[in-house]
Amino acid sequence: VWFGFTLQHTRAHFMRSVMESLGYIVKRNIDSLADMGIEVKEIRSLGGGSKSDVWNQIKSDICQIPLETVNSIEAASLGAAILAGKATGIFKNLNEAAESMVQVKKRTLPNTGNKTVYEDGYEMYRKLFGDLDQCFKKSI
């Protein structure tokens, strides 16, 4: 759902809003993990979207934690290789396999200057998500 747009907004605004909404989903997932007592100290990003410095900065700013991109953008292949390394006994555990195969390519730190604007945006996202949740569950 696009909310609050006017005729003065451009394609660029819409594109950025998509990146921000996906960043809010990441934040919601991190908040859910925190509710279970799991602290997320950094985000690891891979796949095609990780090539975008702008999007990486948005996610880091929204979540206010560092984001790291890794040397592989082929997430499925990397995951399969990690699992295969563990399954065949090459590595003792998944952490050892991952540490062997994954190298951080770039680290993006959150811009604290964007904290308030994204906190406000996240609260609006949560409110709209809650208000529209039942609408999404209905079929037309």
Residue ranges and their predicted role:
Residues 1-140:
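Glycine/Thr-rich phosphate-binding loops that ligate phosphate moieties of nucleotide
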